[in-house]
A protein has these predicted regions:
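Glycine-rich phosphate-binding loops of nucleotide-dependent enzymes
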Residues: 2-257
Length: 257
């Protein structure tokens, strides 16, 4: 078996005295979309911030493409080929749309390649071409999410970290965004680590998944298997098994507890 593109082992990260994630281990295979599911506060964002260097992990190791990135600065990690699309998008509101996209290519020096990639981004997100001279702060929420993904794509990443791309978007826009995520994976060969509360959409999009609860991984498997798991169906997909006359007679707890 080939070495995973990203390998995280026994990761622990703290917020002061509070343990945010504890003993987290997982792999991301090159070419795949891997998702981490979990409720709000489970530690999903902390995992991504630890991987990209935005937060320092107190314990554990992070390896990317066979090289340790544990404890390195975010700009160094980004230059290795990891691009982060943060929760809440975090675009530069007073810069133009094109200016935001060019910020994604700040570490690149191949002008011709940058222009080609800009055309690729505009191909996936035509509205960004139409609004390229507008201030990014005037874009809608969905357009800002497209801009955040496009900005990450401009870095020509090997691995893209996506933090809650469905946050605050309408169901129609969520479907559009996740369709583009699948296309980027298939057509541009971008490996992705996706954290998402919308378990239904995440499991439809990803190849492999992990369930994170209270800072620890409690379940993993291929997504087509996870959607059949009784706990995942009830507690993350909202599908309940019913008893006689369509009513459940007891409140079941999760089997992994």
């Amino acid at each position: 078996m080939s070495e995973p593109l990203l390998s995280v082992r026994n990761l622990e990260t703290y917020y002061g005295p509070i343990t945010a994630i504890r003993g987290v281990s997982f792999d991301v295979t090159e070419g795949q979309i891997v998702t981490i599911l979990g409720a709000n506060g489970a530690g999903k964002t902390t995992v991504l911030k630890s991987v990209c260097g935005a937060m320092e992990a107190q314990k554990g190791t992070i390896s990317f493409a066979g090289r340790s990135v544990t404890g390195r600065e975010p700009d160094w990690v980004a230059r290795q080929g990891i691009a982060h699309v943060p929760e809440g998008r975090e675009i530069f509101p007073f810069m133009t749309v094109k200016g935001n996209l060019m910020m994604g290519a700040y570490s690149r020096h191949d002008r011709g390649g940058i222009e080609r990639d800009l055309d690729i981004v505009y191909g996936y997100f035509p509205v960004l071409r139409e609004r390229q001279s507008s201030q990014a702060g005037y874009l809608s929420g969905g357009q800002q999410q497209m801009l955040a993904i496009g900005r990450a794509l401009m870095a020509r990443p090997k691995l893209m970290l996506l933090d809650e791309p469905s946050l605050g978007l309408s169901p129609i826009l969520v479907k559009e965004i996740f369709g583009i995520i699948r296309r980027l994976n298939q057509e541009q060969k971008v490996t992705m680590l996706l954290v998402e509360q919308n378990a239904n959409m995440a499991l439809k999009t990803a190849h492999y998944g992990y369930v994170l609860e209270v800072g620890r991984i409690v379940l993993e498997g291929a997504c087509e298997k996870l959607v059949e798991n009784e706990d995942v169906r009830e507690f993350y997909l909202g599908v309940k098994e019913t008893a006689v006359r369509g009513k459940k007679r007891w409140k079941r707890t999760k089997r992994w507890r």
